[in-house]
Amino acid sequence: MSTAIRSGRQSNWEAFCQWVTDTNNRIYVGWFGVLMIPCLLAATICFTIAFIAAPPVDIDGIREPVAGSLIYGNNIISGAVVPSSNAIGLHFYPIWEAASLDEWLYNGGPYQLVCFHFLIGISAYMGRQWELSYRLGMRPWICVAYSAPLSAAMAVFLVYPFGQGSFSDGMPLGISGTFNFMLVFQAEHNILMHPFHMLGVAGVFGGSLFSAMHGSLVTSSLVRETTETESQNYGYKFGQEEETYNIVAAHGYFGRLIFQYASFNNSRSLHFFLGAWPVVGIWFTSMGVSTMAFNLNGFNFNQSILDGQGRVVNTWADMVNRAGLGMEVMHERNAHNFPLDLATVESTPVALQAPAIG
C-alpha cells in the first residue's frame, strides 16, 4: 500500500487564499474584500477626478449642459458629479459604448461608472461583514444592520432611476445635488405624506434620541474606580469581566423618570432594540422610495375640507401641495413648459369667483 506524501511547500495560490481569509490580519480582506477593494477604489478615483475636472453634462438631453466640477466654477457645496443624460436613459453606458471620450463625458458617463462600482463595492462590504463574523464565530446581525443604509443607497441610485426610466433622475453626487434631489422628489411624489417616510423619520430621530439617552444613562451610572482628580475613563480596563456601569441604578432612574416599564431590565434586549429601531425605520424609507419610484406616491389630501357652501378650507396638506407645485415649476425649467401636475389636470383657479364685468 502506497501513501502519497504532499510537499511541505505551499503553492502561491494556497498562500494567497490563506492570507485573504486570515482573521489575524490588521485589516481583514476576505473573498468579498477581493471584490470590494477594486470597486471602491475605481469609484473613489473616478468620483474625485470628475468632481474636480469633468466637463458639463447634458443631463436633460436637450443640449443644455450643466456644469458640476470645481474647475468650471463650482465650490465644495455646489459641485457634483452630474447624472448621465436623459438621452442615454437606462442604457448601460461604459466608455467603450461612446464614440469618443468627449462624448462619454458630455453624456455623463462618469456618473454610471461611479454609481455601479460604488453599489457593487458597498454590497461586497456587507458580504465582508458577514464573512468576518462567520470566521470569528459571531452572530450575523452586524451585516443585517448595515443592510439599512445599503438599501437606501440602492433605492436612490438604482431603483429610483429604473422606475423613472432614466439615470438622469438619479441622485447627483454632491451636497447641493442631494438637496435638489430631495426637493424634486417631494414635488413629484409628495414623500412627506408617505407613511414609510414617516416611519423612516421616526427611525432616524428616534434612534438618535435613544442613543443619546443610553449613552447619557450609562455615563451617569459608571462604577467609580478612580479618584475625584482622575478621569473616570481610566477606571475601565479593556476586556475586564465586571460591568463598568450599574445597570440597576440606570434602570431605577429611568423607570422613575418616566414609568417602570419604559425602562429595560435586560441589557441584551436593550441593545437589540437600539439596533433594530433605526434599521427598521430606514428599511421602510428605502421601501417607500422604491415604491414611489414607480409613482405610487404619498397620500393626497389636497382640498379635502369644504365649508357649507363648497368652498375649500385650506389645510397643511394644501400648503405642502402649493410648495410642491412651486418646486416642480422651477426644476428642469427648460425641459418642459409646465410641470405634469399643471399640464394634465384641471387648472386650479386663482380667484374663488369670477369678477363681474359691466
From Swiss-Prot:
GO terms of molecular function: chlorophyll binding; electron transporter, transferring electrons within the cyclic electron transport pathway of photosynthesis activity; iron ion binding; oxidoreductase activity, acting on diphenols and related substances as donors, oxygen as acceptor; oxygen evolving activity
Keyword Repeat: no
Protein name (database record): Photosystem II protein D1 2
Oligomer and partners: PSII is composed of 1 copy each of membrane proteins PsbA, PsbB, PsbC, PsbD, PsbE, PsbF, PsbH, PsbI, PsbJ, PsbK, PsbL, PsbM, PsbT, PsbX, PsbY, PsbZ, Psb30/Ycf12, peripheral proteins PsbO, CyanoQ (PsbQ), PsbU, PsbV and a large number of cofactors. It forms dimeric complexes.
Origin species: Parasynechococcus marenigrum (strain WH8102)
Residues engaged in binding chlorophyll a PD1: 197
Record: residues binding a quinone: 214, 263-264
Membrane topology: Multi-pass membrane protein
Site (Tyrosine radical intermediate): 160
Site (Stabilizes free radical intermediate): 189
Ranges that cross the membrane: 28-45, 117-132, 141-155, 196-217, 273-287
One Gene Ontology cellular component: photosystem II
Family: Belongs to the reaction center PufL/M/PsbA/D family.
Pfam families the UniProt entry points to: Photo_RC
Gene name as annotated: psbA2
